[in-house]
Design a protein with these regions (language model features):
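All-alpha prenyltransferase/terpene-synthase fold signal
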Residues: 1-329
Length: 329
């Protein structure tokens, strides 16, 4: 890759589109505004939780890199962020998560019923804004991705024996739940570009999303909690099997395999159980394997950029690859 990870920040990546990202936040607030006081309260909370706007950033950068001058780019970026927020709200409700971005989740602060309805509301607002564009192409792309994410979530819920989850199923899940929205954001950013550039943007987003998700799953094994100094192991506590564990399961000796099974059979695994499984995964090469897979997808993303013309926006997209695989959270 062209730059060292230590030299790439999100601010660097967003610099070519920073002014329009502020407008995206304003457009999102306008888009989800509601008259009902309860919905207004939830919206205020959601806007305070505003994340990194990474997906809108990718959309605006691919729009810049493709050089199409599409005046709808900011609105499309806000639509993508609304859909992303909807998925987070629904995911937190399904997982009974307490915190998101260091703040209480909607289901914690309000209720599970409110979180389900608000997720639906954000989806419906996105659909309304798409319809107002009077163009079927972004509707086709975004309806396809929302369907993929929904099926992916159901596929995860339907995995009755988590320890039978293999790498093919894992990649299918990552592609549907994460990479699909990355790919859609990048494709929509290049909607008015030449077909080859639109395809390149979509391929870039897909590969970047895969690298991003694998890195996210790695962080669950490597990120230290401030108090204990041990890996957080949040996914393991929730009995979620991700690539680092998948990579070693088939070759673990029977006694160590039984330790993993004991954790997954425990309704509430304790910190020592989690720490022990994390050590087993690391000692047997699971973290290294996952890093290698993330790096492979990063190379795919970088190769896709070769079909976009040289520009500062394309450079920022290249930096986004480094950021995705080297970030701490």
């Amino acid at each position: 890759m062209t730059r060292q990870a230590a030299g790439v920040t999100l601010a660097d990546i967003q610099r070519p589109v920073a002014d329009r990202l502020d407008t995206v936040a304003e457009e999102l607030a306008r888009m989800i505004a509601a008259d009902l006081p309860l919905m207004q309260d939830v919206n205020r909370h959601l806007l305070r939780m505003k994340g990194k706007l990474f997906r809108p950033t990718l959309l605006l950068l691919t729009h810049e890199a493709s050089g199409t001058g599409d005046p709808r780019a900011v609105r499309l970026a806000a639509i993508v962020e609304a859909i992303h927020l909807a998925t987070l709200i629904h995911d937190d409700s399904v997982d009974h998560s307490v915190l998101r971005r260091g703040m209480p989740t909607v289901n914690t602060l309000f209720s599970h019923q409110v979180s389900v309805i608000m997720g639906d509301y954000l989806y419906s607002r996105a659909i309304i804004e798409l319809a107002r564009l009077d163009d079927l192409e972004p509707v086709r792309v975004m309806s396809r991705v929302t369907n993929a994410m929904t099926v992916g979530e159901m596929r995860q819920l339907a995995a009755f024996d988590a320890l039978d989850f293999d790498e093919r199923q894992y990649e299918l899940l990552c592609r549907s739940k994460t990479a699909s929205l990355f790919a859609a954001a990048c494709e929509v950013g290049a909607l008015r570009a030449e077909p080859a550039q639109r395809l390149a943007a979509q391929r870039y987003g897909d590969a970047l999303g895969m690298a991003f998700q694998i890195t996210d799953d790695l962080l669950d094994y490597t990120e230290a909690e401030a108090v204990t100094g041990k890996p957080s192991g949040h996914d393991l506590k929730e009995h979620k099997v991700t690539l680092p564990l998948i990579a070693v399961l088939s070759r673990l000796p029977a006694p160590e395999r039984r330790e993993v099974e004991a954790l997954f059979h425990s309704a509430a695994p304790d910190g020592e159980q989690v720490a022990r499984v994390v050590r087993l995964v690391e000692q047997n090469g699971g973290l290294e394997y996952a890093r290698d897979r993330a790096a492979a997808f990063a190379l795919e993303a970088e190769a896709a950029l070769d079909d976009l013309p040289s520009s500062s926006a394309r450079d920022a997209l290249r930096d986004a690859i480094v950021y995705a695989v080297e970030r701490r959270r």
